[in-house]
């Protein structure tokens, strides 16, 4: 089988999963974890925050991210499921 260059989750999903596992990760660490630039992580964090999937709490000079488990998934195919259900399946 040829090596695939795609994944089942988007970079948004990867960042969300990383923050669910470690809510105090720094942007640099998230970029390394996901394999994208820090700038891309910043855009994703803004998308997730603006979309209501993530909130940010300042703790001194650091950010603490809170994933909104009750938020519905965006695509019509999965809209009856929540972020928490997706993360729960991936943690299992």
Predicted regions and their residues:
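Short, locally clustered residues in the helix-turn-helix/winged-helix DNA-binding domain
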Residues: 17-21
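Amphipathic alpha-helical dimerization/coiled-coil segments
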Residues: 72-92
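Short capping segments at the starts of secondary-structure elements
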Residues: 22-26
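Alpha-helical residues within the helix-turn-helix
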Residues: 29-32, 49-50
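Short alpha-helical segments that sit at the start of domains
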Residues: 1-14
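Short, Lys/Arg-rich nucleic-acid/phosphate-binding segment
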Residues: 58-64
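Short, hydrophobic-biased segments on the C-terminal half of alpha helices
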Residues: 45-46
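Key DNA-contact positions within bacterial/archaeal DNA-binding proteins
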Residues: 39
């Amino acid at each position: 089988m040829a090596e695939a260059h795609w994944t089942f989750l988007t970079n948004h999903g990867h960042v969300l999963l990383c923050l669910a596992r470690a809510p105090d990760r720094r942007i640099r660490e998230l970029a390394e974890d996901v394999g994208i630039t820090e700038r891309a992580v910043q855009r994703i964090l803004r998308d997730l925050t603006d979309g209501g999937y993530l909130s940010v709490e300042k703790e001194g000079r650091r950010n603490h991210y809170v994933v909104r488990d009750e938020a519905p998934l965006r695509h019509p195919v999965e809209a009856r499921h929540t972020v928490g259900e997706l993360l729960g399946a991936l943690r299992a």
